[in-house]
């Protein structure tokens, strides 16, 4: 498959990130490597979305601290970004709402038609909302260029800080190449872009707990968006899926990363990291990046059992 015929993917991870660990970052890397190896996907970006303060989890430090730690953890990555939208809302947001927000945001920022897993758009079009007196995002009057994956991610990076806290309306997009020499309307090569929820097997397992998730939300998350699961502690994701009728129904929309089941980062967790910090355990350097450790010590976070 050529680059333009592959599905372009943005991986979105929601969670407490209390604190963000090396395991979280490796989850992104392992998922990207696995999707690339399938030959069907190109991962063009990753988004870390920390949960709102009102989530109510015991020991959850403020979003201000968690956002800073997340930013420190991804500062050397050229494709993973931290998004504060969820933290900046008036109250806690469901995972479904976060996915829908980012789908709408990507439509506005990139000009892509984002398709659902089950009902992919047959003719995704690249371009800009049809507003008067506006120039297409990718238009260049001198050198016509295609909106490549790198340009899409770059545009996201340029605009995210400006509009991340605004929920844009859903619109259709078209792109017209106003090339005076050709005098004709051209359509750029089609690029299909999807946002997939990235999670560990623990979140997948939570889908099986009766009453914990809204079933309508689960239908949207798994049925419309799709999930990439990176198993932890050698968990059997296939066995977990068999315990949920919705997961079984949309099992083709759930991609389980099957690489090294003994990956050292698969046993790293925020809970272990907090305990290591509370007990002065030197193994904390195996769980957290040094900039995150330095910030935690400077801010006196997780020093006692209450967080």
From Swiss-Prot:
SUPFAM superfamilies: Nucleotidylyl transferase. Its cofactor is Mg(2+). Nicotinamide/nicotinate-nucleotide adenylyltransferase that acts as an axon maintenance factor. Axon survival factor required for the maintenance of healthy axons: acts by delaying Wallerian axon degeneration, an evolutionarily conserved process that drives the loss of damaged axons. Catalyzes the formation of NAD(+) from nicotinamide mononucleotide (NMN) and ATP. Can also use the deamidated form; nicotinic acid mononucleotide (NaMN) as substrate but with a lower efficiency. Cannot use triazofurin monophosphate (TrMP) as substrate. Also catalyzes the reverse reaction, i.e. This is Nicotinamide/nicotinic acid mononucleotide adenylyltransferase 2. One of its GO terms (cellular component) is axon. It is found in: Golgi apparatus membrane; Cytoplasmic vesicle membrane; Cytoplasm; Cell projection, Axon. GO terms for biological process: cellular response to angiotensin; NAD biosynthetic process; negative regulation of cytoplasmic translation.
């Amino acid at each position: 498959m050529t680059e333009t015929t592959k599905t372009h993917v943005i991986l979105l991870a929601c969670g407490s990130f209390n604190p963000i660990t090396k395991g979280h970052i490796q989850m992104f890397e392992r998922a990207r490597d696995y999707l690339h190896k399938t030959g069907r996907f190109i991962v063009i970006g990753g988004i870390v979305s920390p949960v709102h303060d009102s989530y109510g989890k015991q020991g959850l430090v403020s979003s201000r601290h968690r956002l800073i730690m997340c930013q420190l953890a991804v500062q050397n990555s050229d494709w993973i970004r931290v998004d504060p939208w969820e933290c900046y809302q008036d109250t806690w947001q469901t995972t479904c709402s976060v996915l829908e927000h980012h789908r709408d945001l990507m439509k506005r920022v990139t000009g892509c038609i984002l398709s659902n897993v089950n009902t992919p758009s047959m003719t995704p079009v690249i371009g800009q909302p049809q507003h008067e007196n506006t120039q297409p995002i990718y238009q260049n009057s001198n050198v016509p260029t295609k909106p490549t994956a790198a340009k899409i991610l770059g545009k996201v990076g340029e605009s995210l800080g400006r509009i991340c806290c605004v929920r844009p309306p859903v619109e259709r997009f078209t792109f017209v190449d106003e090339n005076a020499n050709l005098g004709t309307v051209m359509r750029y090569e089609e690029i299909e872009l999807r946002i997939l929820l990235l999670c560990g097997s623990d979140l997948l397992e939570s889908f099986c707990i009766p009453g914990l998730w809204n079933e309508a939300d689960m239908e949207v998350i798994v049925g419309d968006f799709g999930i990439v699961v990176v198993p932890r502690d050698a968990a059997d994701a296939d066995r977990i899926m068999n315990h949920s009728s919705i997961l079984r129904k949309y099992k083709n929309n759930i991609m389980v990363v099957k690489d090294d089941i003994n990956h050292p980062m698969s046993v790293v967790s925020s809970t272990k990291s907090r305990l290591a910090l509370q007990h002065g355990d030197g193994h904390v350097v195996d769980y957290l990046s040094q900039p995150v450790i330095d910030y935690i010590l400077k801010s006196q976070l997780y020093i006692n059992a209450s967080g």
